[in-house]
Amino acid sequence: MDFNQSFEDIESQLDNFVIRKNQQSEKSTGKCGPEVHDNVPLTISQIERATQDPENENVFITDDVHPIHFCTCIIYAFVTGNGTHNESFMKFMIDDGTGSLEASITKKPFNGRVISSLYSEASSLASSEAYKSIAVSMMRLLQVSMEYIDPTRISRGHSLFLRGRPNRFRGKMGLDAFQFFIDSGRSRNMEIGFVDYLTDWQRRHKTMQNTTNK
């Protein structure tokens, strides 16, 4: 660490790390057979039509001309209503214009308690001039962290990024989400950006499949 940096500089770097933390590899190649991908951008209609790989229960296959084998996916959708919540999950009905399904989002209560405890400690330090600057910065970072782990903040009308995997229960396809991000912006920039990313990713996959099959 550069000791000439201000607390604001350090906070900016930490905030940047939280937002741009390394994600899992986008794809992994098995010993044989098709490539199995992680974090694939998909539409809800693709998830609804996906089937489980009979040779690997952790892998799903899209029902496309150029099928995608994947373990985890990313979607962007609008919250249209609540499902039936339980002790472990918050459940929401989501729609992206191509289809709708129920998404289950893990509550992660332990992480929430840890962050709340740290926030209380930082808040008590903020009353001291010696620690006020770094304590206030830490409080802001902890507040941002809660936005990524507390699904109770989600409500009807929110737009979400969700990372998870399909789950078929009683004949209906749903999504088990491990991570979420609430798009609180008033513009549609993030939605449009996701559509562009999805289109580009699937175009590259199609090109790769055509090249492989030649």
Curated annotation (Swiss-Prot):
InterPro entries: NA-bd_OB-fold. It comes from the Eukaryota. Changing D9G: Disrupts interaction with moi/modigliani. Partially rescues null mutant phenotype. The keyword Lipid biosynthesis does not apply. It is found in: Nucleus; Chromosome; Chromosome, Telomere. One of its GO terms (cellular component) is nucleus. Changing K91E: Unable to protect telomeres from fusion events. One of its GO terms (molecular function) is telomeric DNA binding. One of its GO terms (biological process) is telomere capping. Its main location: nucleus. Keywords: Chromosome, Nucleus, Telomere. Disruption phenotype: Lethal at the larval/pupal boundary. Frequent telomeric fusions in larval neruoblasts. Probably homomultimerizes. Component of the MTV complex, composed of moi/modigliani, tea and ver/verrocchio. Interacts with moi/modigliani and tea (via C-terminus); the interactions are direct and require fully intact moi/modigliani and ver/verrocchio. The MTV complex is recruited to telomeres by the HipHop-HOAP complex, consisting of HipHop, cav/HOAP and Su(var)205/HP1 to form the terminin telomere-capping complex. Interacts with cav/HOAP; the interaction is direct. Interacts with Su(var)205/HP1; the interaction is indirect and probably requires cav/HOAP or moi/modigliani. Part of the MTV complex that associates with the HipHop-HOAP complex to form the terminin telomere-capping complex involved in telomere maintenance and prevention of telomere fusion. As part of the MTV complex binds single stranded DNA in a sequence-independent manner, protecting it from degradation. Multiple telomeric fusions result in multicentric linear chromosomes that resemble little trains of chromosomes, hence the name 'verrocchio', the name of an Italian train named after the artist. This is Protein verrocchio. It comes from Drosophila melanogaster.
